[in-house]
Regions:
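Receiver (REC) domain switch-region micro-motif
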Residues: 3, 89, 150
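Short, hinge-like loop/turn segments at secondary-structure boundaries
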Residues: 52-57, 107-109, 129-133
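Helix-loop-beta element that forms the nucleotide-linked donor phosphate-binding surface
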Residues: 158-162
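A generic structural signal for well-ordered alpha-helical segments
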Residues: 28, 101-105, 143-144
Length: 162
């Protein structure tokens, strides 16, 4: 199977999502799947645009400087996937790059799946942005309901999207 895997976080970043995505991508490739990894380029990394990976331009998050979010370059993704069409686009994170991936996949008629693992709306209170909780929760619902399927680890998280 040929699939595109889109994430805002990937090693050398060290966090649960980055490490899980890395294991998943390596596992798919080991099993013979062609995986086009799309992720933001880190400051110390060179540009990379090959058949198996694209490091998109990105910007650092203000409160998490070690993490860069990808710019929402819909037309660039649409062109990339029109040339080398995946059978499926999977979006692991809900940032601008993930949203662009959903839009690009829809433009060329490729099915899209996503992961919902982190309640960022609940995190907003922890970081002093509790007033954003409803907005963030609404965005997460909108994001995941724009995909064909969303993978969740618990029934409670599934219900949070309805």
């Amino acid at each position: 199977m040929r699939l595109a895997y889109v994430t805002e976080t990937y090693p050398p970043e060290i966090n649960g999502v980055a490490l899980t995505v890395d294991r998943f991508v390596r596992g798919l490739r080991t099993r013979g799947h062609a995986v086009d990894l799309v992720r933001p380029r880190q400051p110390h990394e060179s540009e990379c645009e090959s058949r198996s990976e694209w490091r998109s331009p990105g910007i650092p998050l203000p409160m998490y400087r070690d993490l860069r979010i990808g710019l929402p370059l819909i037309s660039r993704l649409t062109k990339r996937w029109s040339v080398s069409r995946p059978q499926l686009v999977h979006v692991a994170t809900e940032g601008p790059l993930g949203w662009a991936a959903i839009r690009a996949a829809r433009t060329i008629g490729v099915p899209v799946t996503s992961d919902f693992r982190t309640n960022f709306d609940q995190y907003s209170e922890h970081y002093g942005f509790g007033w954003l909780r409803g907005i963030v929760g609404g965005y997460l619902k909108h994001f995941h309901n724009a995909t064909d399927r969303t993978f969740v680890p618990t029934l409670a998280l599934s219900k949070a999207l309805t």
